[in-house]
């Protein structure tokens, strides 16, 4: 299963926090299918969070998410969506600190907006969100061409590219 994971500006701004989150991804055996860092344009951010438009936190969220670089990942794992959400912990940092203190948000989150990470909440959301950040990525092509190679191994993690690839290919196929 694929999911989108975002590392928010509060974490990207601090190299040690960014590296800690990245290591959590690796140590939990996620395959990093794609990764990119970007400065989010306000109009793209508003479109992404349009379901929250009109809510009290919407403008603050858009301003924060466009305030600095973010890192976007496509992660693969059995039950990737649920596993990533469990690793992140509850959205509300106060709750995360009490219910899941070892989660990413419980240990690194600052506020409910500056809570370090975002993750897709369903298969439908994951597809939509992946397309928003990786418009040239084809899920269908990935499942047909790359996923079987990654599943059957051997798999290599390339620190230079920040992604996993089948050992014999040396990198992802162009989208």
UniProtKB/Swiss-Prot annotation:
InterPro entries to which the protein is assigned, alphabetical: NDK-like_dom, NDK-like_dom_sf, NDPk6, Nucleoside_diP_kinase, Nucleoside_diP_kinase_AS
GO function term, MF aspect, one: nucleoside diphosphate kinase activity
Q: What is its EC number?
A: 2.7.4.6
Q: A Gene Ontology biological process annotation?
A: negative regulation of cell growth
Q: Which UniProt keywords apply?
A: ATP-binding, Kinase, Magnesium, Metal-binding, Nucleotide metabolism, Nucleotide-binding, Transferase
| Role description | Major role in the synthesis of nucleoside triphosphates other than ATP. The ATP gamma phosphate is transferred to the NDP beta phosphate via a ping-pong mechanism, using a phosphorylated active-site intermediate.
Q: What is this protein called?
A: Nucleoside diphosphate kinase 6
Source organism of this protein record: Rattus norvegicus
Its encoding gene is what?
A: Nme6
